Amino acid sequence: MNYAAIGCVVGHELSHGFDDQGRRFDAEGNLNNWWDDETSAKYVEKTKCIIYQYGNYTEPSVNLPLNGINTQGENIADNAGFKQAYRAYGKEIAYSMSKIWLSNR
């Protein structure tokens, strides 16, 4: 299975439910602030990092900086997609290695 492709796409799309726009909707799809204050504060701190990171990137073909605020939803989803694909790949490697180890006993 190609974890790089499938994991990134699935992880990316699922993560949109928790990006700067998707997090505002509850389980029924209603616009509702369903996160407690502590969770929201932690989220804001983490998104500041992503906004800063991508806001400091200049697109060389046009020599213009990205707007980290405007692109945060996609940037959050991209990062989450990569992270979940990597985790799934790691689990597959561990599982495969355990099968090899057990078959050699």
For each of these PLM feature ranges, what is it?
Residues 1-5, 16-105:
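Zinc-dependent metallohydrolase catalytic domains
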Residues 9:
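P-loop NTPase nucleotide-binding module
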